[in-house]
C-alpha cells in the first residue's frame, strides 16, 4: 500500500475522555472514531488489526476441529425466557421490540441460540462431538462505557460452543480449546497468563481466563513464580495465616476509641498492629417471607472481603450489604463500632480462616466510640457459626499448592473458557439419542475471545511515550518504507519502490510513504501508529551505499548496504 492512496488521519492530541493509553493512542493514530458512548467506527488501520486477529483466531479454531457458522445479533426473547436469563441478566441486556411489539434482544452472548440449534440439529450420538464457533458483533449496555475498546458497548467476539455425549468427552473438548487458546495468544505475540476463574453469570463448573499482563488491567492475577498455580483473585484460595489459636493472654476490656470508626484508626489509637484488629461486615439475604437474614462476616483488619467467595457460602447466595436500619436493629449501633460480642439481636457469624485462629483481638463493642480489647473465642463470645475463606489473597501469602509464596499482577481478560455441563441443554431440552437409543442431555462447553478487546490490551502492553509498538503478527503493516526526499530524488524513489515491490512479492505487509513529508513528521507519525520496522531511504545514505533499518522497539537505527536491504529487512522481521 502507498500512503498517498491510503486514509491516514493522525491527531496530535487525544480526546479528554480518553483515560488510558490504548484509548488515547488508538484515537490519535486514527484507528477508531467515537460515534456514541461505547460505540466506535473502526477506521482502516484499526480494522486491519482486527482482521489480522480474526485471521489467527480462525486458523487455530479450524485447526482444533471447530466449525464456523454465523448466528444473528438480534435474538428472540423467548429463548432467553426459556433459559431463565431474561430475568437474570440485568440492565446490560438490551431489550428491543419489533413493529409487532415482539420482544428481542441484541445479543451479549449466544448460549441460547446455539443450544436451540443443537437441539434441532443433533439427534444421535454419532454426530458428536461437535464444536461450532462464530466471530460476531455483540452488545452489552454497560452502565459506564469507558476505556475505548476495553469496555465498550458494541464489540466483536469469537464464541465457540462444544457439544459432547458425556462429561468425559466435554472435558476433552475443554482441554482442546484451552490448548488452542494458548496457541492463539502466543501467535498474537502477547505476554499472557491462563488463570483459574469464577464462572460468573455464564455458569458451569470449570473455567479459565486468559489474561494479558498490563499495569492498567482491571483484574488482579494471583500466581506462584515457583509453580504453575495461577488464578484470578476472585478465586484464589487464601490460607489461614495462623496454624493454631494461642491461649488467651488478656482480659476482655471495653476501651474508648472516640472517632476511630476504621480498623486503621483503632490500631493507631491503641498502638497495636492492624493485624490484631477485626473488621465487621454486615450482609443481608432477603427471604421470600418476613425480614431479611442478617449475617456478620469477620475479617482481619488488614484484609479485604472477597464478595465472590462470600456469595458461594451456604445461605449467602444473592446477598446484599445491610442497610443502616438493619444494622441499628441488630447491633444497636451505627457502622464503625460493630462486633460479634453481645449483639442486640441474633445474627449469623462467619469468621475468615485467619480470624478463627486469632486470640486477644480487638473488635467493635456495638457501642459508639468503644471497642473491645483482649477478645477471645470461646471465652468472650461463642465460636463462629461458620469458618470459611472470605478474603482476597495478598502478596506473599503461602501458595495453595504448598510451593512458595504468591505474587500478584494486573491483567486484562481477553479470553475465557467454561465447562458448562448441562446448564443450558437441560433448560432448553437439548437432547440426543445415546448408543442405547435412549434420550440423553448434551454436555456443553463455551469459549470466548474478545477480538476488539485484544486490540486495546495489546496496546496497553506494548507502547511508549511516542506511540504504539505492535507485535508483528497483528500490526496494521509489518514494514514502513520512509523515503527522505521522495519528490526531489529519482534515486531515492527508485530504491524505495524496488524494495517495496520486492517485499510485497515475498508476502510482507508493507507501506510505502510516498507523500513527500518532512522526515521528522513522517517518522513521528509512523512511531505513533506503531509499525514494527521502518526502512529509511535517503539520498545521503544512498551516497554511502546504505539504507537504515530501525525496529520500533529499538532506540538506534542500523545501516545496511543497499544490495542487502531486502535480505536484512526480512531477517530483522523474523526477529520481531
Curated annotation (Swiss-Prot):
GO cellular component: cytosol
Keywords: Aminoacyl-tRNA synthetase, ATP-binding, Cytoplasm, Ligase, Nucleotide-binding, Protein biosynthesis
UniProt-listed Gene3D superfamilies: Anticodon-binding domain, Bira Bifunctional Protein, Domain 2, YbaK/aminoacyl-tRNA synthetase-associated domain
Entry EC number(s): 6.1.1.15
The reaction(s) this protein catalyses: tRNA(Pro) + L-proline + ATP = L-prolyl-tRNA(Pro) + AMP + diphosphate
Single GO term (MF): ATP binding
Pfam families with a match to the protein in the record: HGTP_anticodon, tRNA-synt_2b, tRNA_edit
Class of enzymatic activity (EC top level): ligase
InterPro entries, per database record: aa-tRNA-synt_IIb (IPR002314), aa-tRNA-synth_II (IPR006195), aa-tRNA-synth_II/BPL/LPL (IPR045864), Anticodon-bd (IPR004154), Anticodon-bd_dom_sf (IPR036621), Pro-tRNA-ligase_IIa (IPR002316), Pro-tRNA-synth_IIa_bac-type (IPR004500), Pro-tRNA-Synthase_IIa_type1 (IPR023717)
Record's keyword annotation contains Cytoplasm: yes
Subcellular location: Cytoplasm
Presence of the UniProt keyword Transmembrane helix in the record: no
Biological process, per Gene Ontology: prolyl-tRNA aminoacylation
Primary site of residence: cytoplasm
Self-association state and partner proteins as the record states: Homodimer.
Role this protein plays: Catalyzes the attachment of proline to tRNA(Pro) in a two-step reaction: proline is first activated by ATP to form Pro-AMP and then transferred to the acceptor end of tRNA(Pro). As ProRS can inadvertently accommodate and process non-cognate amino acids such as alanine and cysteine, to avoid such errors it has two additional distinct editing activities against alanine. One activity is designated as 'pretransfer' editing and involves the tRNA(Pro)-independent hydrolysis of activated Ala-AMP.
Protein family membership: Belongs to the class-II aminoacyl-tRNA synthetase family. ProS type 1 subfamily.
Domains as described in the record: Consists of three domains: the N-terminal catalytic domain, the editing domain and the C-terminal anticodon-binding domain.
Protein's UniProt name: Proline--tRNA ligase
Gene: proS
